Regions:
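Conserved glycine-rich cofactor-binding loop
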Residues: 9, 16-17
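Active-site loop immediately N-terminal to the catalytic Tyr-X3-Lys motif
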Residues: 95, 142-148, 170-171, 189, ...
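Alpha-helical segment proximal to the catalytic Tyr-Lys
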Residues: 122, 166-167, 240
Length: 258
């Protein structure tokens, strides 16, 4: 399936590592010109060298000055696709997280996206085409008690996506939210391997994963590549009728009708 992304330029925030890097790789494989983003000097350059693709850009988008730095670096490029992948799930609780930590979560998970949307949206409107894809979590619909500042901020990102979709009606710019459940990262795999071996589930990942995923209807944990493939499809002209949606990719965990 050709996603028709050749000639499109995509910025993937936080793509110097993890799921963001895999999203950048997937978009590049589909023909897009990809800007690989790091928050600190050297991060994006190292990722581009590792991947053998993309162009490095830098800016700490958790504050206005860093976002402006990033926008200035991209002054000669028209961004067709903005993937707001960057975000963090810092540990916390209702009794221990300070109000400052709540503000930090909002800066990282909401305003980092808002700053770039505000800056890049006028050119997308003028072009009559664009894609804005925000990375959320199923926790914005079903939050846990722990890390409340994280879930509250991701809930704000979800409602921001819907508000923006209404603003962009009939503009040619599409905006959606991708909400993964648990994703198989190296850290998740290592944690479950250690737990599984302690509990006697087995010694290999193939033996342990069915136990780790016992509450997931598909019987396994979602891979980062699957999230990247969904993002790439939403970034493409083929997804033109998908707008203002919160698309869950969780293996069927969130069994609700909405």
């Amino acid at each position: 399936l050709d996603l028709n992304l050749t000639g499109k330029c995509a910025l993937v925030t936080g793509s110097y590592r993890g799921t963001g890097m895999i999203i950048a790789q997937c978009l590049a494989r589909e023909g897009a010109r990809v800007l690989v983003h790091g928050l600190k000097a050297g991060q994006a350059e190292a990722a581009v060298e590792q991947l053998g693709l993309g162009e490095p850009v830098t800016g700490d988008i958790t504050n206005d000055d860093g976002a402006a730095q990033l926008i200035n670096q991209m002054a000669g490029s028209h961004i067709d696709v903005l993937v707001n992948n960057y975000g963090t799930a810092d540990a916390g609780s209702w009794e221990t997280s300070s109000s400052d930590e709540w503000v930090v979560a909002y800066q990282k998970n909401v305003l980092s996206a808002q700053r770039l949307i505000t800056s890049l949206l006028p050119a997308m409107r003028d072009a009559g085409w664009g894609r804005i894809i925000n990375l959320g979590t199923i926790g914005s619909t079903r939050p846990n008690a722990r890390n409340p500042q994280y879930y509250a901020s991701k809930g704000a990102l979800a409602t921001m996506t819907v508000s923006l979709a209404k603003e962009l009606a009939a503009s040619g710019v599409r905006v959606n939210l991708v909400s993964p459940g648990i994703i198989l990262t190296p850290e998740v795999e290592a944690a479950y391997l250690a737990r599984g071996q302690r509990k006697g589930w087995g010694s290999t990942w193939d033996e342990i994963e069915p136990h780790a995923a016992r509450d997931i209807p598909i019987g396994r944990i979602t891979r980062r590549e699957e999230v990247a493939s969904l993002v790439a499809y939403l970034a493409s002209p083929l997804a033109d009728a998908i707008h203002g949606q919160n698309i869950k990719i969780d293996g069927g965990i969130l069994d609700i009708v909405s």
